[in-house]
A protein has these predicted regions:
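Carbohydrate-binding surfaces of carbohydrate-active enzymes
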Residues: 114, 219-220, 224-256, 264, ...
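Glycine-rich, aromatic-flanked loop segments that form ligand/cofactor-binding clefts
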Residues: 40, 68-72, 99-144, 181, ...
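Active-site-adjacent "subsite" loops/lids of carbohydrate-active enzymes
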Residues: 120-175, 208-223
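Aromatic-lined carbohydrate-binding/catalytic grooves of carbohydrate-active enzymes
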Residues: 65-98, 122-139, 189-200, 264-270, ...
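Short, acidic/polar
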Residues: 49-62, 160-170, 263-270, 332-338
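N-terminal structural segment of carbohydrate-active enzymes
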Residues: 29-80, 110-112
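N-terminal export signals
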Residues: 5-26
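Aromatic- and glycine-enriched glycan-recognition loops and surfaces
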Residues: 47-65, 87-110, 162, 229-233, ...
Length: 721
């Protein structure tokens, strides 16, 4: 939020309590090194690179990246060691070498960990010939193939004693690996193989549906069953590892929030898998030139950290493979910006390349890998054991994405979450992204406000928890069809959160969508105090038909466009009684209900008026002044973390178009941060300089003279006793 917004908001702040997400499990055990942000480099080795492979050169190139762990190709589709497991293809290019043993020994000598990459998603024709029932089948019985390989079903013995377990045992007993990285886990698509049919029949006493059909109520059951099947597979693999050797790191590639349907397609629910891995790892592969997803790396890191309750691993794809250019790098400034966001929100990094350093055609991002991993290494004292703090929680609901979003999940739900998160970042409101599992009384109490961007699917228990939270002094900001559907995606007769929203669903209203319409100011309110010089704001999108209840008020209502044909006949927008922004106040709590998809509209249009409405709504709901006021451009992202006696303000500069081609240096950024205690020192970490400051009444004021791509302001407070 800018200084101007703060002055115009007409709300004055007292202190600012912050939430603290405490990692599950203590980090004192040095054997569990993954409880701190990790620095992983992953040179995806191609089989052809075995020719003339130089172990010394390989390890030196890995050490140059500042990584503390290297993901090395081990087995699955190709064995990079002399495996004795049946059907485990050993590359003839090894020529008798035990490459895995050589590399592990050399990495350990150089002070780096060795993480064995295994891929149990596909197999060769010989295994398909001998065990055809282990493979994914389409509804017509045909096998699913990826190139010359056959896709394997995670419900089959292949992921157990048939193949995966013997490979894991062989590697653990013969090699001093520090962990495993599972590539391409989950389902490659809907599977109708005999194993899936038998398992589904045994569980539900019904035939396995041939596809996900949202018109069929069984699809909710089918989607949940697929998630559970994947989780069971990963848990079995983890247990097998633990049975051979304790404290072995185990992770697998999961979806980032930039690819919202990947989780459902492959049946990889991050919340459901939170206990299946040592660390949760999510891929951010947003290589397409979409300017609206500039915040998605940080959003993903924040979400996965809160779900896993420990530092996540953000797998940043260096190339533009998702856009069709596997051998071309993302622009270095763009790639770095994604890495800084992940770091700023408490994540570790895994930086992959498609090929070994020195052999790939486009190595421009190797310098970025070295710089960002180097920052994590040099300033480990800042990142290790630091915990995110924020007054606001934004909820990402996988259930809403699945059962409300259905076949149009991005447009119906994800775009709303993207838009509101962007508005929070661009109003400089520190925010943590949580799952809908956090909508419980004990967890909600950690936050001063909870944001529900079109969270349509809300259970009765969640509705009760949110209602009690608001009545006890918390704040809720919700949009569009939040709570209009039950957890299975069935529409209710009314809003489950009607009591706190101050609105009742009115399906008789004829207004459900609007194009080139307006949010019109109807009465003065703090949320609209910034609207000087205008009483109308542009809007196009979907409207939830509601009517006011109780003492709620509607500062903004729907205005129709009127005649748009000729200037001579053009009329002012026609105000209606249809409420679009509803404010409700209780004895201590507050709520804002935006009865339209203004968040989606902001994501798609990037019109600044929508950002300011959403930001002002959150500030008003918080009940006092913003936790942070700055003159920084809206494209500077802020996040906060705490490690006593230090508070860290992370600044990520995203100024510029997308893909980002260069870093635009910004000067003289003034910050007013409510910290609630005395301050000893303020310094800029990366520049290595102290900053003059003024501390008064629990607020510290300072100026950052210059901001490049990323900076951390370190605020030292008196030691806690």
């Amino acid at each position: 939020m800018t200084r101007r917004d703060f002055i115009e908001s007409s709300v004055f702040l007292a202190g600012a309590a912050s939430s603290v997400l405490t990692p599950a499990g203590a980090a004192e055990d040095s054997s569990q090194w993954w409880l701190k942000p990790v620095r992983l480099f992953h040179p995806n080795m191609r089989e052809s690179e075995l020719r003339g492979f130089d172990t010394g050169r390989f390890v030196a190139s890995c050490a140059a990246t500042n990584a503390d762990g290297i993901v090395v190709s081990a087995g699955g589709i190709v064995a990079f060691y002399p495996s004795q497991v049946p059907y485990h293809y050993v590359s003839p290019l090894l020529n008798g070498r035990d490459l895995l043993k050589e590399v592990i020994a050399a990495l350990h000598t150089a002070g780096m960990r060795a993480i064995a990459r295994v891929d149990f998603s596909k197999a060769r024709a010989d295994l398909f010939r001998d065990h055809p029932d282990w493979f994914v089948r389409s509804a017509d019985g045909s096998p699913r193939m990826a190139g010359k390989y056959y896709d394997v079903c995670p419900n089959s013995p292949y992921l157990g004693e048939g193949f995966a377990f013997p490979v894991i045992r062989e590697i653990l007993k013969g090699y001093d690996v520090d962990g495993f990285h599972l590539n391409a886990g989950g389902f490659p698509g809907h599977c109708c193989c005999s194993k899936c049919q038998e398992k589904y029949q045994a569980r539900f006493g019904a035939k396995l549906p041939s596809r996900i059909d949202w018109k069929d109520g069984a699809s909710t059951q089918l989607v949940s069953w697929r998630y559970q099947s994947s989780a069971e597979c990963f848990t079995r693999l983890h247990e097998e590892i633990g049975a051979v050797r304790k404290d072995v790191f185990w992770t697998g590639e999961l979806a980032g929030l930039d690819n919202p349907t990947w989780s459902r397609d492959k049946a990889l629910d991050i919340v459901g898998l939170s206990h299946s891995f040592s660390s949760l790892m999510s891929t951010v592969d947003n290589a397409s030139p979409d300017p609206d997803l500039r915040w998605v790396a940080g959003m993903t890191a924040s979400y996965v950290r809160s779900v896993g309750e420990r530092p996540p691993i953000i797998n940043l794809k260096v190339s533009m493979r998702s856009a069709g250019w596997a051998h071309a790098s993302m622009p270095p400034a763009e790639y770095a910006q994604c890495a800084w966001q992940a770091i700023a929100h408490g994540g570790g990094l895994k930086m992959p390349t498609f090929g070994l350093p020195g052999n790939i055609e486009d190595e421009r991002n190797m310098a970025v890998i070295t710089e960002t991993l180097g920052a994590l290494k040099k300033h480990a004292w800042v990142y290790d054991d630091a915990r995110p703090i924020a007054p606001v929680a934004l909820v990402w609901s996988q259930r809403t994405l699945d059962f409300y979003g259905r076949d149009d999940a991005k447009a119906r739900y994800a775009d709303c979450a993207y838009g509101f998160y962007a508005a929070l970042m661009e109003n400089h409101i520190p925010t943590v992204v949580v799952s809908d599992e956090a909508l419980l009384p004990g967890k909600l109490a950690d936050f001063r406000a909870v944001v529900l961007p079109n969270m349509a699917c809300v259970s009765d228990a969640q509705a009760r928890a949110i209602t009690e939270y608001v009545r006890a002094g918390g704040a809720m900001i919700a949009t569009h069809e939040t709570s209009l559907y039950d957890p299975s995606g069935n529409r209710r007769a009314g809003l489950a959160l009607e009591q706190v929203m101050g609105a009742a669903y009115d399906p008789a209203s004829p207004t459900t969508s609007a194009k080139n319409a307006y949010l019109c100011r109807r009465q003065p309110h703090a949320v609209t105090a910034w609207m000087r010089g205008t009483s109308v704001l542009p809007f196009s999108g979907r409207i939830t038909p509601v009517r006011l209840t109780g003492d709620s008020v509607a500062p903004l209502v729907y205005g129709s466009a009127g005649n748009l044909v000729d200037p001579e006949e053009m009329e002012n927008p026609v105000r209606t009684d249809v409420p679009l922004l509803i404010a409700n106040t209780f004895s201590s709590g507050k709520s804002i209900y935006v009865a339209c998809d203004l968040d989606r509209f902001y994501f798609r249009s990037r019109l600044d008026d929508a950002r300011r409405v959403l930001g002002s709504a959150v500030v008003w709901a918080l009940g006092d002044s913003p936790p942070l006021v700055t003159n920084a451009p809206s494209e500077v992202g802020v996040s906060l973390s705490r490690k006593a006696p230090f508070t860290f303000l992370h600044l990520v500069n995203t100024v510029g178009g997308r893909p980002l081609s260069e870093v635009v240096t910004i000067r003289d950024l003034e910050f007013h941060l409510r910290i609630g205690t005395k301050v000893k020192t303020v310094s800029a970490l990366r520049r290595g300089s102290t900053l003059p400051f003024e501390a008064r009444d629990g607020q510290v004021t300072f100026t950052v003279p210059i901001l490049g791509a990323y900076e951390v302001v370190v605020i030292e407070t008196p030691s806690e006793r």
